[in-house]
Amino acid sequence: MSTKEQVNELFTQTVDDWARFYEDPKPAKMSSQNLVSRRRFAIEMIEAKLPKGSKILDVGCGTGHLAAELARRGYDTWGTDLSQGMVDYAREHYNRDRFQVADIEKIPFPDNFFDGIVCLGVMEYLVTDVNALREMWRVLKPGGHAVVTTPSSICPFFYIDRGLIRVRFAVRPLTGAVRRMLGGEQRPAQPFPKVQHRRYRKGNWVKLMRSHGLELEDWACHSWGCYGLERFFPQGAFCRASDRFARNGLLNWVASDQLSCVRAIK
């Protein structure tokens, strides 16, 4: 199975989960709170750069919540996603004519069509960035803006989380055996997730975008905390700190996600 097929399968299986994340205005879990923060930062960047009525493409639109929110705020929005399940959900709940299945490496719109692009939680699942950056630059108008997120490669919490996940999957056969001995309910076995999830260092990422005609104009980092241990820590405190220090250069290395707002140079 190719990388794109794996990603498509993963997100098609979790459509309802993602819908619940975005529909909950006050999510309890830290991971969900950080998704809400990411969306808020992206909207703030778009509103700071583009007037109402601008044409916006949400690449990797998922269930369509962000595109719908931007439309509610007065933008002319479209959405594309690799997952048929995600697009079906967006069409059912929002504008049917504005969502379609498409690959970020082959965006189905003409050159210089959009004033803005939002691309949240997409780049890390690609094999390479080159084609995606080239396509975003192509469909942006000269001077158009894109807001793109990438996970940070230096966030310490990421490595803690990965270790905890591996431990959890390693001990699952043992916990299953104990549960059987005690006559408890059996849970279906789940394989360790194999979908790739690349991470980025700011300097290298900025250089790569610049080499594809995308000049950095704004930058923020967010999402603090270890998801694997979130039940043991005050989640609200982590999220408040993440929001407060989103543009603090000394503390950005702690955050797990990076948002870059870039302008298309043509």
State where each predicted segment sits.
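Class I SAM-dependent methyltransferase SAM/SAH-binding core
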Residues: 63-106
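Short catalytic micro-motifs in class I SAM-dependent methyltransferases
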Residues: 121-125
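Conserved class I S-adenosyl-L-methionine
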Residues: 1-50, 53-60, 147-177
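A conserved beta-strand element that flanks and buttresses the S-adenosyl-L-methionine
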Residues: 118
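A C-terminal cap/extension of S-adenosyl-L-methionine-dependent methyltransferases
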Residues: 168, 179-198, 202-210, 216-266
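A short glycine-rich, Lys/Arg-flanked "PGG" loop and its adjoining helix->strand segment in the class I
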Residues: 130-142
